[in-house]
């Protein structure tokens, strides 16, 4: 892509593969969240009507859970290098009040800030916990009754934590930080957004746009 086209259309934030995988994980999680409420909480049983009925939900929930886990493992492999914490992340954490108050940090942030990395690792841990605790619920014969009850309790607790994290993630991506969503729908963000929220990454992308086209996460110091 030419320098002028890069400036006119915005900066490539996420590749097509990244976007497809992100939305696959997001949509499978949304199904798991809704079906999880239906299965686990009697007052939410009305959700069955929107999800194909109780028998269908109980059949699909663990299968979609496996699909979600596979997608998240692929996402972990894809973004692992970008999600490693560094000195800038510690500085970002110290400047957290400014970020919460203004939606912007004074730290020279790269492609992902410490908050995004923190949420990513939170999702990795809780996703793994949901898969592990979900197995005894899918195959009750794997463990004794007492362990099954513990797995069920942990599954519920981790599920609620994950839902809370998901709500915060959606809020920050839409209401708190306008201009973020286009990066995950069309792949591009404005140059102003990139320079304001991820200045270090923005400078690297600006430099790279003059040369051979590179993947959005390929520019690392």
Set out the residue ranges of the language-model regions:
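Membrane-embedded alpha-helical bundles that constitute the cytochrome b-like, heme-associated redox core
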Residues: 1-221
């Amino acid at each position: 892509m030419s320098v002028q086209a890069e400036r006119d259309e915005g900066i490539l934030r996420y590749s097509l593969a990244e976007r497809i995988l992100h939305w696959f994980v997001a949509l499978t999680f949304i199904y798991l969240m809704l079906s999880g409420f239906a299965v686990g909480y009697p007052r939410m049983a009305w959700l069955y009507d929107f999800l194909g009925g109780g028998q269908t939900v109980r059949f699909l929930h663990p299968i979609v859970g496996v699909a979600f886990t596979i997608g998240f493992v692929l996402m972990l492999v894809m973004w692992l290098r970008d999600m490693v914490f560094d000195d800038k992340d510690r500085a970002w954490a110290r400047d957290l009040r400014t970020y919460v108050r203004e939606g912007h940090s004074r730290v020279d942030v790269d492609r992902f800030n410490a908050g995004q990395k923190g949420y990513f690792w939170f999702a990795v841990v809780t996703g793994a916990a949901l898969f592990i605790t979900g197995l005894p619920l899918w195959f009750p014969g794997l463990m004794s009754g007492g362990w099954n009850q513990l797995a069920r309790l942990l599954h519920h607790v981790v599920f609620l934590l994950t839902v809370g994290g998901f709500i915060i993630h959606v809020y920050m991506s839409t209401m708190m930080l306008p201009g973020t969503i286009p990066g995950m729908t069309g792949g591009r963000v404005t140059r102003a957004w990139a320079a304001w929220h991820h200045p270090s990454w923005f400078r690297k992308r600006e430099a790279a746009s003059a040369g051979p086209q590179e993947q959005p996460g390929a520019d690392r110091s």
